[in-house]
Regions:
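Structure-specific nucleic-acid interaction/processing domains
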Residues: 1-142
Length: 142
């Protein structure tokens, strides 16, 4: 099952997209899950460089690699068990928001979870809400 954004199947994410907030729906029971996913992960590798004076120095090389967002079905153990048991064809994955920063992703995910009252109902797989975002990362950026 592919991701949908505004009812359109998505194969690639926009260039400026750092991550996205999503909704996964169990089509059989109606239960839902709100989460966030980063588009790329940072990968650090080390390279040994020989300097002019003959000494060796380790150089950090940082790069971005694609995350597993295409195959991702959330971090909830209960949701993951249902996906394995019922099959991916019984779930709908929707992208609600594209985010331009990690902070924006965290904030919008928590805002959606509080707005939908995910902890107050068994209609959601979400078991906890965890967020820590500084206001300066959000004000005037959303």
């Amino acid at each position: 099952m592919t991701w949908l954004y505004q009812d359109t199947p998505i194969e690639t994410l926009p260039e400026e997209c750092v991550g996205f907030v999503y909704l996964i729906t169990n089509n059989l029971s109606g239960r839902k899950y709100i989460g966030k996913k980063l588009a790329k992960f940072s990968k650090t590798t080390y390279k040994t460089v020989k300097q002019k004076n003959g000494t060796k120095k380790r150089k950090k090389i940082r790069s971005k690699i694609d995350s597993d967002w295409r195959e991702y079905y959330g971090s909830s153990p209960e949701l993951t068990a249902d996906v394995i048991t019922l099959g991916t064809e019984n779930f709908t994955r929707e992208i609600l928001y594209y985010c331009k920063s990690k902070s924006e992703c965290s904030y919008i995910e928590a805002r959606e979870q509080f707005t939908r009252k995910v902890l107050e109902s068994r209609d959601y797989y979400n078991g906890h809400i965890q967020v820590r975002v500084h206001g300066s990362h959000i004000i005037d950026k959303i």
